[in-house]
Each structure stands twice: as C-alpha cells, then as structure tokens.
C-alpha cells in the first residue's frame, strides 16, 4: 500500500465516524479501511464523545481488534436489526454494486449489510471502477468437498477460477466458516451482477459469493487532490 493510498484510507475512515450516533448497533466491516474506522471508534468511545455503541463484527479479525479496543460486541445471531453498517469494498461500480471478499469475509459481511438500515461503503479512489471483475477476481465461498464441482460449473459459464491459497500456511485459505474460496475471473468482466449473483449461489456447494447487489446506500471515497487528502460522498441518484 502506498503512502497516498494510506492517506486516502485514513481520511475516509475518519469521515465514516461522523455517521455514527450514540446508542447505535453498528456493523463493523473487515479489511484495512474498516480497521482504521474501528480504531477511531475505539478512541471516540474511550474519550466519551460516542456512547452506548454495540458492534457486530463481520470477521474474527475485526472481533479481535474491537475487543482489544474495548468496543462492546454482540454476535450477529443475537441481533434482529443493525442501525448502520460500515465496510470497505474491493471494487465499486457506478451503480453501487460491489465486489467484496478480498479477506474471505464476504459471507458475514453480506449478512450484516442485508439487515442494516443503512450500509455505507468506505474506499479509496483506486476501488472505483466502470465495470466489475476486470481487475479484481470475484470470491466464491464453497464447501471443501464441492470446490471442484463448483469450479466446473464456473468454467461452463466461461469463467476461470483458482482455489485461493494461503500465504503463511501450506494449502488453501480456510474461511471463518471452515470453507474454501474460489477466485473467479470473467474475461469481459461482469455485465449483470444481479443475475450472476443468483446464478452462482444456485450452484450446489456454494455458500455465498462476493457480489453485493442493491445493498449500498452511500459510498465515501478517499481522494488525493493537490497532495491533500479529501473525501467525496457518492449517493444513489
């Protein structure tokens, strides 16, 4: 990550804190930008400028970080609604459709986003794209016994897919749910995210894929202009 990208992430994480109000049940996203937001939230709670916040983590990593910062937490299964969810994304298209799952947390992230009254996405400007999947591969979480079957189904759709391998252990990445991840690339990108999301999720052995369709309410984009970081707020037309 470049210094400029870090500046953009910090700026947008700070902007996101302004969305949080006392007493909220808050979906805590995963990834580097969300982690910066969680750290800032911990500071606000410690100094007393925010109060009575309950966080619902979307990953084990986020749960550990929030716990270390003293943020009160509640499991997803223990809540019926979430006031606000704030999370990052790997790609955002002009219609606010997303690809998420670079950290293999997209199952929990989508659960939290789906019951949130508002879902705000925080990204730096490098994540804004005209079309999904031309650069970033689409993660698909699969049951371990089914990954080859799902890979064949994806190949039949015209996609190329690879089993995501771990960097600091022998073998594949294992998700918080104990599953594997296929990273999927369509040569011409994804033209119809809504249809593809449903199509992939209908394959036997698929738990969830990283397309987030019609969930996002607002996108906060960190930018650098004339060497100064700023935040651009994008809202649905």
Swiss-Prot record:
Superkingdom in the source lineage: Bacteria
GO terms of biological process kind: D-ribose metabolic process; pentose-phosphate shunt, non-oxidative branch
One cellular component (GO) term of this entry: cytosol
Residues making up the signal peptide according to the UniProt record: none
Cross-referenced InterPro entries: NagB/RpiA_transferase-like (IPR037171), Ribose5P_isomerase_typA_subgr (IPR020672), Ribose5P_isomerase_type_A (IPR004788)
EC number: 5.3.1.6
Residues annotated for substrate binding in this entry: 30-33, 87-90, 100-103, 127
Active site per database record: 109 (proton acceptor)
Keyword terms of this UniProt record: Isomerase
One Pfam family cited in the UniProt record for this chain: Rib_5-P_isom_A
GO MF term list: ribose-5-phosphate isomerase activity
SUPFAM superfamilies hit by this protein: D-ribose-5-phosphate isomerase (RpiA), lid domain, NagB/RpiA/CoA transferase-like
Enzyme class: isomerase
Catalysed transformations (reactions): aldehydo-D-ribose 5-phosphate = D-ribulose 5-phosphate
Pathway(s) annotated for this protein in UniProt: Carbohydrate degradation; pentose phosphate pathway; D-ribose 5-phosphate from D-ribulose 5-phosphate (non-oxidative stage): step 1/1
Protein task: Catalyzes the reversible conversion of ribose-5-phosphate to ribulose 5-phosphate.
PANTHER family the UniProt entry points to: RIBOSE-5-PHOSPHATE ISOMERASE
Subunit text: Homodimer.
Membership in a protein family: Belongs to the ribose 5-phosphate isomerase family.
Protein name in UniProt: Ribose-5-phosphate isomerase A
Gene source species: Prochlorococcus marinus (strain SARG / CCMP1375 / SS120)
């Amino acid at each position: 990550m470049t210094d400029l990208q870090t500046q953009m992430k910090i700026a947008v994480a700070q902007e996101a804190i302004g969305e949080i109000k006392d007493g909220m049940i808050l979906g805590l996203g995963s990834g580097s930008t969300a982690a910066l937001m969680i750290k800032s939230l911990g500071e606000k709670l410690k100094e007393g400028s925010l109060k009575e916040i309950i966080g619902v983590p979307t990953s084990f990593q986020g749960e550990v970080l929030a716990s270390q910062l003293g943020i009160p937490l509640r499991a997803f299964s223990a809540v019926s609604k979430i006031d606000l969810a704030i999370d990052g994304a790997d790609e955002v298209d002009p219609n606010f459709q997303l690809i998420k799952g670079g950290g293999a947390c997209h199952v929990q992230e989508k659960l939290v986003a789906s019951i949130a009254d508002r879902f705000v996405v925080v990204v730096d400007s490098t994540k804004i794209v005209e079309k999904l999947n031309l650069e970033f591969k689409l993660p698909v979480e699969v049951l371990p016994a089914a990954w080859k079957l799902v890979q064949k189904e994806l190949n039949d759709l015209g996609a190329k897919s690879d089993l995501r391998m771990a960097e600091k252990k022998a073998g594949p990445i294992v998700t918080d749910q104990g599953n594997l991840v296929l990273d999927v690339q369509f040569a011409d990108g994804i033209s119809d995210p809504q249809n593809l999301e449903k199509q992939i999720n209908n394959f036997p052995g698929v738990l969830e894929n990283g397309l987030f369709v019609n969930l996002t309410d607002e996108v906060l984009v960190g930018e650098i202009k004339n060497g100064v970081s700023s935040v651009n707020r994008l809202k649905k037309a």
